[in-house]
Structure formats: C-alpha cells, structure tokens
Amino acid sequence: MRVIIEKPADGDEDEIIVRCREPDDEIMSLIYSIAAGRSKLTAYSEDGIVKLSPKEIFYFEAVDNKVFAYCEKQVYEIRRKLYELEVTFENSDFLRISKSTIVNVSKIVKLVPYFNSRLEAVLENGERTIISRQYVPDLKRKLRVEEDRR
C-alpha cells in the first residue's frame, strides 16, 4: 500500500481519497480511526467543560452510573453511556475489556497474565487495568496477537 500526502491549494479544504480494489477490514479500520480521531467528546471536570480528542483518552470506566474518561493526568466525566461510547468507537483503537471498562489499545504498553485467565494491561501513564477473560480473545484479535502453540 502506498501513502501519498499532498498539500491542497490555498482555499481548498482537506480531503482524504482512498483508492482500493475492495475496501477490506484494514482499510475500513483506518477510515474509521481517522473519522473518530477528528471527533471531540464533551467532558466535564471541576474546572469546567472541555473538548477531548479520543487520542488523549487512555480508557473509559463506568462507576456508580457515571462514565469517566481517564487521560494522562486528568479524569473527566463523560455524560454518555458506556455502550454508546463502545458503538461510537467500535472501529477505532477502543475496545471493551470488561463490563465497566473500554480501553484505548494504542495506549497499552504491556500485557501481563493475571488470575483466572485474565490479563492485566499496563498503560503508557503507568495505570493498570484488568481485562476480563471474556474479552481476552477480542483484545488478541485487535492486537493481532498470535497464540503460543507449544
């Protein structure tokens, strides 16, 4: 696959053109990632209301009927349901890893085996989160992890 970047003429808006014989999963995932990356989420904190880019978010977590977005150093309330975020970001780097958590897989630096066939994900900011065994196969597919067949 070739990638060509051209500067548009003055006054023209940015555009992305995809030329392919058949849009496969990889190309569609790339398109969805670009679209999701440009969208902003409204987030609330004690300091006020901010707009968050999805790439700033490490994970979402539902606690006591509220959903929070965890960024590198700040936590924000997101006034949407976890399942809505899952649908919004289903073809991007976000993946549900438990009943209450959706993680940005691009922020995972290490996966460590955990009790009862679960995994522990270590994120770029040092935080750790548990991947329920029910979601481990989805994560491995997303990360294209090969099974060790000894």
Regions from the PLM with identified roles:
Residues 9, 22, 47, 82, ...:
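A broadly conserved detector of short glycine/acidic/proline-rich loop/turn motifs that flank catalytic sites
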Residues 26-124, 128-130, 150:
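Conserved binding/recognition cores within well-folded domains
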Residues 88, 138, 142:
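Solvent-exposed, charged/polar functional surfaces in cytosolic regulatory/catalytic domains
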Residues 130-133, 137-139:
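C-terminal structural segments of small proteins and small subunits
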Residues 141-150:
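Short, charged, intrinsically disordered terminal tails
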Residues 1-26:
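N-terminal regulatory/sensing modules of transcriptional regulators
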Residues 13, 124-128, 143:
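Short, highly charged low-complexity linear segments
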Residues 20-22, 125, 133:
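Short, structured patches in soluble enzyme cores that scaffold and shape functional sites
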